[in-house]
């Protein structure tokens, strides 16, 4: 019939940070093949699926992925060869069964995910469809409102800013292409402003600038200045989104948040909640991701009660794209959105399950890249297939980020008049003003 898996190949390639990662090819009987490469994160949740690394310090500083590749060749491939590539759920379940651990530590989530994504791409190609059409069927027509990273701090840079990502969202755009144009204009305007103030305009892992700003507040202030100077209205045309990655600032022993790159302040959960409440009043912020640490569920509840009806509160480290953690969050009334990172959970099937659970509970979902990326554009197709309406995939620089935006521009063109861009209305989990 031609749609059965004939062969699976795997290799070690290099990601955007110069670290090894896994790439897999799934080849069907008729010669059709799908290829996928796996990303990796800098700040990772403690409950994430395990990214299998070799640990041999003499090779790639211990970050080699040859064990994961051997697992694909020796364990996964023999079991999947002969199976139908058109049954994604069966493929993914077979790999989960072969691994048998909650965090995929036996085979490695990087091994499993590469095969999961490559299978879907092979199946799509076999049917003459794009991956977004194959995975999303007739519902795949919503282009995402992008979260574009323009200032980096924390673990993603080497500066005096505590918070990891300051992003802009073109909520007033009419199309995805227009959103990218608006974001690019602000990005270039910001570069000029930073340069004029004597700041460096080198970029971090995700393509945003990493200037040695004097404070966390200054990051918001220069972004607002750039939005205005580019000819847009902050909060109406373009809003700010944050990922402070506070799990990186949290000391579980003292239960304090340490602003270690700036003031050295130590804040209690209550003080951290008040900190964000003041920022939301002061700046045109529409979304905060990981505003509290992943271990601080009580703090998360307080934050949600305080500002969950004003802005989107996204759980990344908190939920790690995992339905069991998301279920707990929904039951507790914690956060109102989930970040979707395919490599946090490890298969496309589980990713779809997490998004479905979020939507049923009235939570939004944002498909996300990782700080260590490749030229693979699967998540661009995935965000359209899932219809989540939001994507987080870095800045308006670095090809590993731009590749995703360019793929979405192509998809928008292909969809023609059926393409939809929802802008601000994607925030259905918060009360609209």
Swiss-Prot record:
Principal EC category = lyase
Q: Which GO terms describe its molecular function?
A: magnesium ion binding; phosphopyruvate hydratase activity
Detail which positions bind (2R)-2-phosphoglycerate: 164, 341, 370-371, 392
Please list the cofactors this protein needs: Mg(2+)
Note on cofactor: Binds a second Mg(2+) ion via substrate during catalysis.
Provide the primary localization.
cytoplasm
Which pathway does it take part in? Carbohydrate degradation; glycolysis; pyruvate from D-glyceraldehyde 3-phosphate: step 4/5
**Organism whose genome encodes this protein:** Borreliella burgdorferi (strain ATCC 35210 / DSM 4680 / CIP 102532 / B31) (Borrelia burgdorferi)
UniProt: Mg(2+) binding residues: 243, 289, 316
Q: Which domain of life is it from?
A: Bacteria
Family annotation (SUPFAM superfamilies): Enolase C-terminal domain-like, Enolase N-terminal domain-like
Query: What EC identifiers does the entry list?
Result: 4.2.1.11
What biological-process GO terms show up in the record?
gluconeogenesis; glycolytic process; symbiont entry into host; symbiont-mediated evasion of host immune response
Record's catalysed reaction(s): (2R)-2-phosphoglycerate = phosphoenolpyruvate + H2O
Quote the protein name from its UniProt record: Enolase
Any one GO CC term of this protein is: phosphopyruvate hydratase complex
């Amino acid at each position: 019939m031609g749609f059965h898996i004939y062969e699976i190949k795997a290799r070690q390639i290099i990601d955007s940070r110069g670290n090894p990662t896994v790439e897999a090819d799934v080849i069907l009987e008729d010669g059709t093949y799908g290829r996928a490469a796996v990303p990796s994160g800098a700040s990772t949740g403690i409950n994430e699926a395990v990214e299998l690394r070799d640990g041999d310090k003499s090779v790639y500083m211990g970050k080699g992925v040859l064990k994961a590749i051997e697992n694909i060749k020796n364990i996964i491939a023999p079991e999947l060869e002969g199976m139908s590539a058109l049954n994604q759920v069966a493929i993914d379940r077979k790999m989960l069964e072969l691994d048998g651990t909650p965090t995929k530590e036996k085979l490695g989530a990087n091994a499993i995910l590469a095969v999961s994504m490559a299978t879907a791409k092979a199946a799509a190609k076999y049917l003459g469809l794009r991956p977004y059409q194959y995975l999303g069927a007739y519902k795949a027509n919503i282009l995402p409102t992008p979260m574009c990273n323009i200032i980096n701090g924390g673990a993603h840079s080497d500066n005096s800013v505590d918070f990891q990502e300051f992003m802009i969202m073109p909520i007033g755009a009419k199309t995805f292409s227009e959103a990218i144009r608006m974001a690019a204009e602000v990005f270039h305007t910001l570069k000029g402003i930073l340069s004029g103030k004597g700041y460096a305009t080198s970029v971090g892992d995700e393509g945003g600038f990493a200037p040695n700003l004097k404070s966390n507040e200054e990051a918001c202030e220069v972004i607002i200045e750039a939005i205005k100077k580019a000819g847009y209205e902050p909060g109406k045309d373009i809003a700010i989104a944050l990922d402070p990655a506070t799990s990186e600032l949290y000391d579980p022993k003292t239960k304090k948040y340490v602003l270690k790159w700036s003031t050295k302040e130590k804040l209690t959960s209550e003080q951290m909640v008040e900190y964000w409440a003041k920022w939301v009043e002061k700046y045109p912020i529409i979304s905060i991701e990981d505003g509290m640490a992943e271990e601080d569920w009580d703090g998360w509840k307080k934050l949600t009660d305080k500002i969950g009806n004003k802005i989107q509160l996204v759980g990344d480290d908190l939920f790690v794209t995992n339905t069991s953690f998301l279920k707990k969050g929904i039951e507790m009334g914690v956060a109102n959105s989930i970040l979707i990172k395919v490599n946090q959970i490890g298969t496309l099937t589980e990713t779809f399950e997490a998004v479905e659970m979020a939507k049923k509970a009235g939570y939004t979902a944002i498909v996300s890249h990782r700080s260590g990326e490749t030229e693979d554009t699967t998540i661009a197709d995935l965000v359209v297939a899932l219809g989540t309406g939001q994507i987080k995939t870095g800045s308006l620089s670095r090809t590993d980020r731009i590749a995703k935006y360019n793929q979405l521009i192509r998809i928008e063109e292909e969809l023609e008049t059926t393409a939809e861009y929802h802008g601000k209305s994607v925030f259905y989990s918060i009360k609209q003003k």
